[in-house]
UniProtKB/Swiss-Prot annotation:
The gene is accD. Zn(2+) binds at C33, C36, C52, C55. A zinc finger (C4-type) spans 33-55. This is Acetyl-coenzyme A carboxylase carboxyl transferase subunit beta. Gene3D superfamilies: 2-enoyl-CoA Hydratase, Chain A, domain 1. Binds 1 zinc ion per subunit. Its main location: cytoplasm.
Length: 285
């Protein structure tokens, strides 16, 4: 037995040689749906306006992609592109976070504004981009939105605003909250001039944005399953000590309760806006 113990064969050692061929998929080629996890070609997904082929989930669009989808080619003129936030309250690390988001998104702030044409009809537009500070509303967002609204009022143009926001920007305190009233005043002047304001609420539209300019459109539209509300679901349940419906704060729930005029699939977004603008154009002739 001892002889066998000392004479047992040693296990052979093997060296694993990795295949020199690189099988990694280049970054950006594929996109995974955040809801159903299906992996799709990014190019094909973009051609479908970032709507998942499998579960129909509306994946976020960038501000410029949204504008491209609803406007005639080459018709968009951007306003106030270089406007950027200061740090009025000297909030720690605020400017560093702003700079980081600027590098990540290529934007100066969380809203893009300007004029464009849709089927030859000119309109003013503001599109929020939730990639930048979660679309939170600060002084620059309020100022840019007011400027484009005032331009539309002076030039008698309809105005379309796509909201996507987590609410007021806490780093700017009361200055951020002031934008709720400021934008509402500009919209009132636009309304008094007999002009059309279309509010298009996308996922998510919450907090101070939902409580101000996002909810006061002449026509309020939304995308399917968009989260729309003021306070969070958990906060409300704890406050009223009741269980809320499963579909609470969804676009469909708001439509059912009269707070939206229509829930529009993104593939029908351009056509729907064109039809509304044509009706307004005929009425105001």
């Amino acid at each position: 037995m001892f002889k066998d113990f000392f004479n047992r064969t040693k296990k052979k050692k093997y060296l694993t040689v990795q295949d020199s061929k690189n099988n990694d998929v280049p970054a950006g080629i594929m996109t995974k749906c955040p809801k159903c996890k299906k992996i799709m070609y990014t190019k094909e997904l973009a051609e479908n306006l970032n709507v998942c082929f499998n579960c129909d989930h509306h994946i976020a669009l960038t501000a410029y992609k949204r504008i491209e989808a609803i406007s005639d080619e080459g018709s968009f003129t951007e306003f106030d592109k270089g406007m950027t936030s200061a740090n009025p309250l000297d909030f720690p690390s605020y400017l560093e976070k702003i700079e980081k988001d600027q590098q990540k998104t290529g934007l100066k702030e969380a809203v893009v504004t300007g004029t464009a044409q849709l089927d030859g009809m000119k309109f003013g537009v503001a599109v929020m981009d939730s990639r930048f500070r979660m679309g939170s509303m600060g002084s620059v967002i309020g100022e840019k939105i007011c400027r484009i609204i005032d331009y539309c009022t002076e030039n008698r143009l309809p105005f379309i605003l796509f909201s996507a926001s987590g609410g007021a920007r806490m780093q700017e305190g009361i200055i951020s909250l002031m934008q709720m009233g400021k934008t509402s005043v500009s919209l009132k002047r636009h309304s008094d001039a007999g002009l059309l304001y279309i509010s298009y609420l996308t996922h998510p539209t919450t907090g101070g944005v939902s409580a101000s300019f996002a909810s006061v459109g002449d026509i309020n539209l939304s995308e399917p399953k968009a989260l729309i509300g003021f306070a969070g679901r958990r906060v409300i349940e704890q406050t009223i000590n009741e269980k809320l419906p499963d579909d609470f704060q969804t676009a469909e729930f708001l439509l059912e309760h009269g707070q939206l005029d229509k829930v529009v699939h993104r593939n029908n977004m351009r056509q729907t806006l064109s039809e509304i603008l044509k009706i307004h154009q005929e009425v105001t002739k």
